[in-house]
Amino acid sequence: MNPTMFQYNRNVQVNGGAFTVVNEHKGMTGELYGIRSDLKPILSYIHLCKGLQILHRWVSDGAAHDSAQHAPVCHPDTRKTIIGDIMSWIGDPSRKSSVLWFNGPAGAGKTAIAQSLCKLCVAAQWLAGSFFFSRHALGRSNAEFLFPTISFALSYAIPDVGKIIDTVVAHDPSIPTKALEIQLQKLILEPLQQVTEEPKEPIVIIIDGLDECEGEDMQSNVLRLLGSVFQRPSVGGCDRLCFIVTSRPEPWIHDEFTIEPLSSITRQIFLGQTSEANDDIRTFFRSGFTEIHDSPKHRLTMSNVEKPWPSYSVVDELVDKASGQFIYPATVLRFVGDPNYRPTDRLDILVSMPAISPSALATKPLAALDQLYSQILSMSTHKHRTLDILIALMAMKESMSALHVAWRTFQLDLLRIAEKLLSLQPGDGSQALRMIHSLVHIPGRLLMSDVADDNLLHLEVQYRDEDGIRFHHKSFIDYLLDSSRSLEYCVDMGEMNARLALASIVTMQTFSLRPTPSRIACSMFL
């Protein structure tokens, strides 16, 4: 029987069939649908992976360093010193600390450094697992997925440990639903302790963006659990285990690192504005502007622009405005490099913005970034509509975590839902966001299929979560929610939630009682 025969069928019944169970298959030759006739290794593998198959249901695929949602790594000519320092710390068998916390303000480049470390640790065969928290990404803001995701990666990084994890979960499939302390113990620590041969290389677990995890108490709890790991006698693989944690320097996170057990086993690195950071940002700018100048997308508009472009003085001015925050050059380069506009004109807009005094930058390092965000929003043709769409998307993404199973099932086009609930015409949302592509990622290609029985959505969009609309950086969300930073562009989440709730009630009156994708969407606000 072809194994794909029933792949796309549901509610299939087979009556009067005859099935033969083959326990012995000696002497079988040839191939069956491309699979070698000796099925023992395959059957053994299927049996072996029962526990891992259960565990995978609790894995946040987008949170891993190598997922399709992964963050960019550092430019190869930047952050060399800090990355080299951390790699040396990992590889030092005599190091006194087992936890490294590098922290910094929004936009300092923490995630890019963490991504680069993951890549290097994979090459060195040191990486056991990683988890990149994200407040507005599906399945990446909830700590319940943290240890199952890391454990699943660990099972493949160290196969002997993977066999133990598989057996443990197959014996007790409820482990991923238990308290985090039990998950850590059963899915990571005990399997590492049971390996017969102690690993000679470091075992590295990287947790990025802990401040993006839901709830201050949960963030503190995760840190306490990591600290408790090293209060126990080192056995087996745990002897070489180390954790790297990145976050903003939030007070409650900082407090955990100042008390035992973490205080005595943690090395801290702060990512602030230094001369080296400025040099790295200058390199980043130079490389990015060169790429824009030489891009085929700008061949006609840039062919007569002489290098170096822009001038060294302009780059120095932009470096000063960055105040050590890598998100600033990243946003500038996306804005200037937009293929729909002439790069020289876009750069002139930024250069002509009012200067910010050094004293203002000293007290408000994000002042230049805020000015840049405001400038980009001011260029939108329909400012109020743009803000409405932005805040509606923020509200829906904020509600996703409570309905993560439903969203994984239906995978709705959030932009079309926002248009409907805000009484806009189809396409108004895309048009409103067209001018701010440097701030918001809009998917270029969506695979769509008709949903004939749903009055809200005429189209159900089949895209992976990483292909959906997303904000390029969380600092833009912070800007929109802080009236002292965004001023006239500040958004009111409470007001928008009320508007969406009222629109949902009106819309749901037209639905049948069946659980369609649109009913799920509207139920977020009720």
PLM region spans:
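Extended alpha-helical scaffolding segments used for macromolecular assembly and cargo binding
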Residues: 503-526
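Conserved NB-ARC/NACHT P-loop NTPase core of NLR-like innate immune receptors
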Residues: 1-497, 501-506
